[in-house]
Design a protein with these regions (language model features):
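Transmembrane beta-strand segments of outer-membrane beta-barrel domains in Gram-negative
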Residues: 1-138, 195
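C-terminal transmembrane beta-barrel domains of outer membrane proteins
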Residues: 92-255
Length: 255
């Protein structure tokens, strides 16, 4: 694990519409400066400074039909050994993560669909995957757990180099009250699979998370977005036990 900061730049180009599809391509670079904490069993953790500047090429697509709202995305992330002289050497990467290398490659993809029935009920589904050719440092790994991935578990409880995560959510029609808009109640199933490449002997290298639960979301006064989820884990996680109960809550403002 580690902490740090980053800054970057991105250029985007919107492609011509293909039927009802909206498309966009983007190219970006991020300059990351992190302090990775490396710990061994029965040893004090050490901090490894790590700098790297990955280049990301991405595609995103969006389609809004009469009943379906579909989104998709694919991104390719290329690690660079040194970009304009910025970047740590291979030894620093190997120390931060066994067999990690600054010249890494990551493929990410996601797709989501929201189907609205004639009654106003909705069935929402999404899946995201990540694949790589080698072990990654913590900033590039695939994480699962928490309100926006697998509810019922702690945020980013499980981490892997490759993985897949999916969710299916059945929502009621939207209700409206004075001062309340788009209030829905839903039930869901979340799941994820993650795996480490080249794990150390003492490391657990594979994680399977799954949960079911109930939740509600609403918008108040056209400004506040409120969401509350209850999650029931179906499997043990790294720190969460099967059958534990967890509530997730978020509130945000949009103007």
């Amino acid at each position: 694990t580690g902490k740090g900061h980053s800054f970057g730049a991105k250029i985007s180009h919107t492609l011509p519409m293909t039927g009802a599809w909206w498309h966009q391509l983007s190219l970006g670079v991020s300059f990351n400066d992190r302090s990775e904490e490396v710990g061994m069993v029965d040893q004090k953790a050490q901090t490894v400074p790590l700098k790297y500047a990955p280049v990301t090429f991405a595609y995103s697509g969006f389609r809004q039909g009469e009943r379906h709202l579909v989104s998709s995305g694919v991104s390719l992330v290329f690690g660079t050994r040194s970009l304009f002289g910025y970047g740590s050497d291979a030894a620093a990467f190997d120390w931060a993560r066994y067999k990690a290398d600054p010249s890494f490659f990551v493929l990410k993809a996601d797709v989501g669909d929201t189907l609205t029935f004639g009654t106003g009920m909705q069935l929402a589904s999404r899946i995201s995957v990540q694949h790589t050719d080698r072990p990654l440092t913590s900033g590039e790994q695939f994480a699962a757990g928490g309100m926006y991935t697998v509810r019922g578990y702690r945020s980013a409880e499980a981490i892997g180099d490759i993985g897949a995560q999916g969710s299916v959510e059945l929502r009621t029609r939207a209700f409206s009250l004075p001062g309340v808009q788009d209030w829905r109640i839903y039930t869901y199933f979340d799941g994820a699979w993650l795996k480490l490449k080249e794990p150390l002997p003492e490391q657990e290298d594979e994680f399977k998370l799954g949960s079911v639960g109930l939740g509600t979301s609403l918008r108040m006064f056209d400004t506040l977005n409120v969401r509350l989820d209850y999650g029931y884990p179906l499997t043990d996680g790294p720190t969460t036990t099967q059958g534990a109960h967890r509530l997730h809550f978020s509130i945000g403002a949009g103007f």
